[in-house]
Structures are given as structure tokens and as C-alpha cells.
Amino acid sequence: MSRKAFVKGANPYMPLWEHVPDGEPRVFTYNGETRVYVYGSHDTERTEYCGKDYVAWSAPVTDLTDWHCHGICYQAADGSILYAPDVVQKGDTWYMYAADCKGSRIMVARSETPWGPFTDPVQTELGFDPGVLVDDDGRVYAYWGFCKSYCAELNEDMATIKAGTLRENPIPHCRAQWSPDDGCEGRECFFEASSPRKIFGKYVYIYSRRVNHHVPELGVYEDCNGFLSYMWSDRPLDGWQWGGDISFNGGEILTDAEGMGTMTFRWGNNHGSVTEVNGQWYVFYHRQTGRDEYSRQAMLEPIDAAQGKDGKVWLGRIVYRDGKPIASCPVEMTSQGPQVNGINAREWISAGYACHLHGGKETAWIEPVYEQRDDISAPVKNITDGTAVGFRYLQFGLQTPKTVTLMMKADGAGKVSVRLDTPGGKEIAKFDVKDGETTVPVQGGIIGKHAVYFVFGMKNGTAEMDRFTFDD
């Protein structure tokens, strides 16, 4: 194996061995250093959602590829499984809203540092998936709910609800077999994952919506809660107006001539939020790996943020006319994440960074890994005839590479076609399917930033893709 660096800080932005879904990004300054902190669940149980601890991760605002784990920051006193948390700062204290006992008991714990440990938990009056906003005037608002949403102002104790402020169902909830039977059929469709923010002086309620109708342009033809959506208001507890969708974890959307879309990555539940870092806004969300929803991973993408003349907050991929926002849609799901110029094509790139897994006679998946090594790779397994494994995007620089090296395992025979920009794009290399590390020449000039796809033509059997790299 060539001795070269392994890609890190792409998408997922944490190491491939880490599994932190439901990430709430927060920008905090401590001892003069400003960092982005992410607080989420921790998929360590492997056979069910989440785990029995929270870990805190952070990165300097100057480099969102350089993430550091501060270790365990909270565990429930009774050792119960913890669902999605949130953390806010008020004064010199950081407050963690911890979802003990699978989210049925919301505790607030305190710390004198943003990375914890968070201690002395007190039970609150909040419910499932709590999100908290400390307003500019110091007043504190909380948002929560599963299927049905709630919000309220909190008392000074940061735990109890201020009398007369509780709002029930501020956002119409989705229809589902486990939800109340008064669910809406409109676009709002609240599901879970409440996350409040203040943007451009407006209140923004970010949440996971469960779509109960077809969205053909995104390849949605069944009930689907892979969206992070938002509403906005002039007030913190009511008056919510539809904003749009920020993120969708169904991968690249392939669109046919009739405008009908096809997802290329297995969607699943979604949870996250947005934050501004050095003038650029980002959405933090999660993806699914493995064959279930118990090994989710933290993802991020840069997004547009703007305000219309009517005061509306626009988030996501925004369409402008004459310099004014007129429409928006979810940002694309990528392999590059914070590496906005593309992943270095000359480093080892794990197959686990794929954002496109589509086609094939059977379903391929990214195999979860847990060993804490810098050179760990998460392979794509169960590759069959027609499977395309795609990466958006790689950076080739100003010089065309001479070779591409692929590491894989196989129990069958076939060919691998390496294609540029689309799964059916220009072929730049071709491999025989076989065990081990194989190097072949690159055909044609390649410079700059491109999507790269490995399209498998299997005569028989299956293959497993581990990693690849380009060389001069």
C-alpha cells in the first residue's frame, strides 16, 4: 500500500469510526478562542438508536476540517440511553438539555466550559427532542415534540415553563400511524428534531418534517422524514410561516426528462440545525450507514442564507432574480462537506465517503466501522452488477494524474468503470474486479473539481470497495 495521507474532515466531518447523529452546532467563545461545538446523540449501542453517553466535538471557526473530541460530556445517573440533546450558553454557564431514558425525561445540567462535563442535572418540564433559544434580551424559549410540537418560555431556573406561555401544535404535525389523528396534509408536517435559531432578527424553527405526499423532483414517492425544514416568525412562540427545506439525506437526485427524480442514497431520519461560521452559513445533519438506522454519521454542507423584502428568511440552495431571493430547495448532499474546493484526489479516499450508492441488482451499503484509527476505511459492501459508487467532489488541481489505484475485495468477476461528473460521464479508467490493490492509467485530461463515480459491471458475484487514490 502506498504511504500517503488518508482524507479526514470531509463528509462525514468526524472520523469514519465516529457515529454522532442529531448534531446541534453551536459557536461558543471560551478563553478567547471561538470554536464550533457539536452536541448530538451517540450511536454506540449498534442494535438500537443512540447510546448511554454524549461526546463533545469541536473545531476552530477557521478550519471546519479539524475536529477534536473532548470526550464524554454527560451520562445519565441511571445509565439509561440518551436521545438528542441541545446546549446553550447564558452568562458564564453552559446548559445541556439531556434526553435521559430515551427522551422521556429531559434534564438540564450545567458546566463552566462548553465541552463539559455537564453535571448536577435537574428534571425539566420539557419533552422529546428539546431545542432551546436564549434571546438577545436574555429570555429563554424551549421547543420540543414528537409528531406534535410544543414551545414555551422558560423561567429563570432554565427548567420550568413560565405560566401562560405554553403553545401546543404551533406547527401542524404530520400524519403517521403513531401520531394524533388530526395531522395535516400540507407541507409543514412537523415530525421531530426541534431546533430554534435567531437569523436576521427573525425566529427560525428548524425541524424534521415527515412528507406525506409525493415530491417527485426529489424522488420521494412514500412517506419520508429525511428532510430538515424550517418555518420563521416575527415572534418566538407563534405566527410561524413556511420557510422551506434546507437539507435532504437521500443523496444525489437523478432527474429524468419528465422531471421525475430518483434518490441515490438510502434516506432515513434527519436531525440537525444551522449556524454561521465566519460569514458562511452551514447546515449540520446526519446520514445513514449500514443496513439500519443505528450507525448514523454527522454531515455538514454550506448553505445560502438571505432575507426577502417581506422579511422572509431564506435558507438552503437559493434562487435569485435581480439579486433578490425568489425560491429555494435543499442543498446537495456531498462527500466534500467542509472541503468546499473538493477532496484532495491524491490522498487515500475511503469508500465510506461516498454520497451516491445507486443501481445494482441488490442494495449496497457503507459498512460501519468503530476501531479508532486514523487510517480506518469504511468499505462499501454488497456491490452487484450496475452499482455506482459516487463521490462529490474531488479536487485534481492543475495537473492531470497519471494513475488511479483501487483497493477492493471480490468473490466474482467483472469490470469497474471510473467516470467523471455523472455515472454515465466520460470514462477515465477501467479496472478488472479482483482482490487487492490495483493501479491503472488515467485516460484523458482531468484538472480542477469533479464528481467521480465507480460503476461496477459484475459478470457474477459481488464486490467490496475499500478505498482509492490518484497519483502523478
Q: Which positions does each model-derived feature cover?
A:
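Carbohydrate-active catalytic/glycan-binding domains of CAZyme proteins
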Residues: 1-472
